[in-house]
Amino acid sequence: MSERYPIIAITGSSGAGTTSVTRTFENIFCREGVKSVVIEGDSFHRYDRAEMKVKMAEAERTGNMNFSHFGAENNLFGDLESLFRSYAESGTGMRRRYLHSTEEAAPFGQQPGTFTAWEPLPADTDLLFYEGLHGGVVTDEVNVAQYPNLLIGVVPVINLEWIQKLWRDKKQRGYSTEAVTDTILRRMPDYVNYICPQFSRTHVNFQRVPCVDTSNPFISREIPAPDESMVVIRFANPKGIDFQYLLSMIHDSFMSRANTIVVPGGKMELAMQLIFTPFVLRMMERRKRAAL
């Protein structure tokens, strides 16, 4: 953990809603004049889309039905740890991009589902911002979680997470319900072993809880609206958190535990702005002092 070269990491499963959290931080950075370098977790997958299909078919032929993007064998955990370590020490490192779509791939003259070449991080950034699956991962070989100054978990209750993944993969990526369901089942062991443990290492967790029936996520026709849910916000260390201020600023919020505040789903972005803007400002103040 470095004061001069701070790191913020957003970690969550596929369909958890990490992208919306990233947009909130982008707004904070823009408003406060913070120059960030963004790292997408997908860029640390070991295989591109075509390679992954081949490797998955090979795994299935050998009886491995749980070959997934969530586990260690299909990700460059060592490279991710090296990036975090290098940035924390000197503000440098190497990154690449994963090109999800034709629109993303066109400027690079590549096919969707491929990686760009590795390149150095831009110089003179104020912080590194990571969004992906493994911002807090720890294994016998690596400890990524030790580097972020602020580690945030985004983890809806499981049925809501599945509804969001089903909706996204069907509407935006053209998959069938059966294909998405197979993916969820295949990933389950790695979800339990690699994704869930990270949320015990985070500094703050955001868990959206629907107030409507999501008993069978595989037949749900739409994602519950923000106003049809509540968000549970848990702080690992509540010291210094002004809960009275948050309660006064966020209508219908309440404390459920000494380190937990619950807010209406439609107020999640406001809550993030109120909670994380002071965090970012303190980071920048410490960064200035560390540079003296």
Swiss-Prot record:
The family this protein is said to belong to: Belongs to the phosphoribulokinase family.
One BP annotation, GO: reductive pentose-phosphate cycle
Name under which the protein is recorded: Phosphoribulokinase, plasmid
Pfam families reported for this sequence: PRK (PF00485)
Residues annotated as binding ATP: 12-20
Keywords: ATP-binding, Calvin cycle, Kinase, Nucleotide-binding, Plasmid, Transferase
Gene3D superfamilies (alphabetical): P-loop containing nucleotide triphosphate hydrolases
Quaternary state and interactors: Homooctamer.
Pathway(s): Carbohydrate biosynthesis; Calvin cycle
InterPro entries in the cross-refs: P-loop_NTPase, PRK, PRK/URK
Keyword ATP-binding appears in the UniProt entry: yes
EC number: 2.7.1.19
Organism: Cupriavidus necator (strain ATCC 17699 / DSM 428 / KCTC 22496 / NCIMB 10442 / H16 / Stanier 337)
